[in-house]
Amino acid sequence: MKILHTSDWHIGQTFYDYDRTEEHKHFFEQLKKIVREEKPDLLLVSGDLYHTSAPSIAAQELYNESMLGLRDESLAFGGMHIVLIAGNHDSSSKLDVDGLLWKYFNTNVVGTIPRDNDESLENRAFYDSVFAKHIIPVRKNRESEILGYVVAIPHCYPQNFPNINPKDGKQDRMKRFIALLLDKVAEVNTDGLPVILTAHTLVTGSNIKGHDAIIVGGLDNSDIGTFGSGWDYLALGHIHFPQEIKGSNGRARYSGSPIPMNFEEDYDHFVNIVEIEKRGEMPQVRQIPIKSLYEMVTLSAKELPDGKRSCMDLLPLLHNFPPHKKVYIRLEVLETGELPPDYIQRVKTALTGKEARYCLVKQEIPDKPAEGEGLSLTAAQVGALSPREMAEIIAPDLFEEAEEGYAELFDQAVTNVGKQLR
């Protein structure tokens, strides 16, 4: 079985007031080309399809058109199965509703994890519905033979997994839920077909390069042992830096995001091609690079010659910047006082007529003494946060102890307030 693994698309992201639709279209054109050339049996998207739980109409149209385009591309070689799971940025319930239609296109969308008043194992009807939703037989088309199995675990807060054993703490619920699904797969997988587990979560020990440690550090994380051993490849989403997980012998990997989400994500971006012959065999993994339409560029005064490190010394670099080079630009300046009041206007004037997109000035005050042990965020970092991410930093217990659907209600409230303020 050949799998195309990708994640963290973040469709609909606005970056410093710049719309990124063109960049996402550029990615999807590359993805269609990869599908055409690699002819995968399965396209697996491990969460964060959208950047927000209330995506715009334009973002939803781009998602739908791109998904149909990928499916149509696969028809030339007999089709491919598509499996998508919700990430922490997505509306899990909305994805579930959309999935009712997508299933007719050989596509499974797994948004939420079912709950019931009676979650004991004696409730056979409940767990039959759980197995039907989260254990997905992979078929190139709806009439073809089974090639393998996907066990799909969307983003879910620990306390919102089914309470299979009342003695479990909330951190144990996820592990027991996954074990239950893998045991069921082992029962039905009598032909020794490959088993793929996919989840959108933070795995302990992951390289979080590009993510703000303050934000990521406040999220629930799971060690590799949480996922058991009844799978051949663990397809992960959530962390944008592509990597294999330590201790997994190369079987567990983050594909990473296809385009950079911030200036710290100035590394190469990929999708993974994974090939597995049968259950128990080592997966063969290849990374296929994705070319960003706009690169992230930081021009820093630190890199200028001594004696020429003022904010004004960066302006000639902007005047001489290649006119047709598509980049987002961040300036890093070293200043002890306030910037000149017309500095930003000078920056924008220097880039007039160029395709470079100015974003921000990051001001660092040299040798600034520490002001305490509390966490702090720069204005730029605050501006890049969503309201939910900011709330999770300020009041993490609010989300950790909340019932299923609370986060989406919070997002909807933010959206409604935004509409009233327009």
Q: Could you describe each region identified by the protein language model?
A:
Residues 103, 203-205, 209-280:
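Conserved beta-sheet core of the metallophosphoesterase superfamily
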Residues 42, 276-422:
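Accessory, non-catalytic peripheral segments of nucleic-acid enzymes
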Residues 121-126, 130-144, 250-323:
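Binuclear metal-dependent phosphoesterase catalytic core
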Residues 19-128, 227:
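Core catalytic region of metal-dependent phosphoesterases/phosphodiesterases
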